[in-house]
Amino acid sequence: MSCARITVTLPYRSAKTSIQRGITHCPALLRPRFSACTPLASAVPLSSTPLINGDNSPLKNTHQHVEERSSKRREYLLEETARKLQRNDTESVEKLKLIDNIQRLGIGYYFEDAIDAVLRSPFSAEEEEDLFTAALRFRLLRHNGIQVTPEIFLKFKDERGEFDESDTLGLLSLYEASNLGVTGEEILEEAMEFAEPRLRRSLSELAAPLRSEVAQALDVPRHLRMARLEARRFIEQYGKQSDHDGDLLELAILDYNQVQAQHQSELTEITRWWKQLGLVEKLGFGRDRALECFMWTMGILPHPKYSSSRIESAKAAALLYVIDDIFDTYGKMDELILFTDAIRRWDLEAMEGLPEYMKICYMALYNTTNEICYRVLKDTGRIALPYLKSVWIETIEAYMVEVKWFSGGSAPKLEEYIENGASTVGAYMVLVHLFFLIGEGLTHQNVLFFKQKPYHKPFSAAGRIFRLWDDLGTSQEEEERGDMASSIRLFMKEYKLSTVEEARSCVLEEISRLWKDLNEGLISIKDALPLTIVKVALNIARTSQVVYKHEQHTYMLSVDNYVEALFFTPLLSS
């Protein structure tokens, strides 16, 4: 099979969009916004396409025929790939490379048991004689939640305590592995400090494609990348490699397109729900939110089998969007106090004293949350309402704290701002909803992880990273509207910094530190909680970086291209 021809190329650092749109404050979870004037919306108007309206009957027979044909081919390719993983005559390092390619291509979920068996199998010291292999194995083990010590890298240091800087592939592999470190793992900190500057210096001397691979790693290391975007990008890159596995590439393309079709179906359902809810029309403000909400939930929970969980969490996210608009723009102080009190009470009588527009929003939240809880009860037998209600109360109270800060003209302490902001961006709300919707590991002990405050370190780290990336991506626009409390300004104030650039550097350093806390989920709480919910926390941080890592003076960027590639543009092979 020849290499794939991909319609949309996806660099990690997006360029500025040609159309600048007005931005109003909204919870970070639900940015970016898309309007009818954007290039994407013009090409694929959500209000008129058969996909969104559910009127896809003319395409039904064609789709069914294509699905049947591709399904048979996919089954064959799955069997072939499984055989390659199970072969005993393949060198261990080649199996590690195969696993790495499978997971980067976005098809790892088909082979989870086989991958786990390979990674847990004995690996001799002779097979880890080179730095590249040792670092690759370390990264794969930790990425998949398997215990491994970084002490394995000590033997690669010379008498001066340094690694071999002439081994570019080894340094690149080591750098990628070092991004999975946790606090206290000094060997990984030293590895990153050694590898990063040397890789940067070597860029001009490297030949393609290694130069491109090193540049991408220095921009966004693999561990920090959003899974579906990485799959799409790597499918294109992998197809250009002279030694690529044609069957593996074909399987990745077939699967990408199949999952994309599934996402279109999910988006149709979310859009239909949102239109039936009629909240925007009844409130008289806000915009349609289905597309941007779903992009977030897909980034946070990409596995195809969690379709209903994505749909239900996107509904909760859309309501958070509306509530944020109320607190930030439309609500008066006395109304917001009443609304917060009504949320605390959580009963229909509590909304009697609310203005009409708040009653509508309250009823939508009340009914949607109860419907989600009914689904959880039906699917898992667990009662989720006390926990979902609690996280909504926590989130609304956090909004109220921000309103009091801004209305009183007082600046919070940096730590206070970041922790409160982890709630207002919606990180904890999403974590709690998805924990119950996914339904894995719903034991009494595990539920306690979501009752204790502050939240467990990896969950708190995910929310804080989200908050900080939001500030990096939107602080200028928010300051122009008069919202002066952001982590950037608070860093400047508390650390007596003279420039915004210095403060932004401090924010990025804090994000790097928080990733070490987040990585602890892979080696600690995963022994209690299922790895799936740990990966939800990781994906919250990854998706926020995709959305907000752009030129600091622009918020709306070509994320539109990401959305079009993820949901509307299939991969083509030739």
From Swiss-Prot:
Binding site for (2E)-geranyl diphosphate: R287, D324, D328, R467, D470
Co-factor requirement: Mg(2+); Mn(2+)
Binding-site residues for Mg(2+) 3, renumbered to this chain: D470, T474, E478
Binding-site positions, Mg(2+) 2: D324, D328
Motif interval(s): DDXXD motif: 324-328
Cofactor binding comment, as recorded: Binds 3 Mg(2+) or Mn(2+) ions per subunit.
Transit peptide: 1-40
UniProt: Mg(2+) 1 binding residues: D324, D328
Keyword terms of this UniProt record: Chloroplast, Lyase, Magnesium, Manganese, Metal-binding, Plastid, Transit peptide
GO cellular component terms attached to this protein's record: chloroplast
InterPro entries to which the protein is assigned, alphabetical: Isoprenoid_synthase_dom_sf, Terpene_cyclase-like_1_C, Terpene_cyclase_plant_C1, Terpene_synth_N, Terpene_synth_N_sf, Terpene_synthase-like, Terpene_synthase_metal-bd, Terpenoid_cyclase/PrenylTrfase
Enzyme Commission no: 4.2.3.26
Pathway: Secondary metabolite biosynthesis; terpenoid biosynthesis
Main localization (coarse): plastid
Domain notes: The Asp-Asp-Xaa-Xaa-Asp/Glu (DDXXD/E) motif is important for the catalytic activity, presumably through binding to Mg(2+).
PANTHER family, A to Z: OS04G0344100 PROTEIN-RELATED, TERPENE SYNTHASE 11-RELATED
Chain's role: Monoterpene synthase that catalyzes the formation of (3R)-linalool from geranyl diphosphate.
Family of this protein: Belongs to the terpene synthase family. Tpsb subfamily.
Name recorded for this polypeptide: R-linalool synthase, chloroplastic
Organism of provenance: Ocimum basilicum
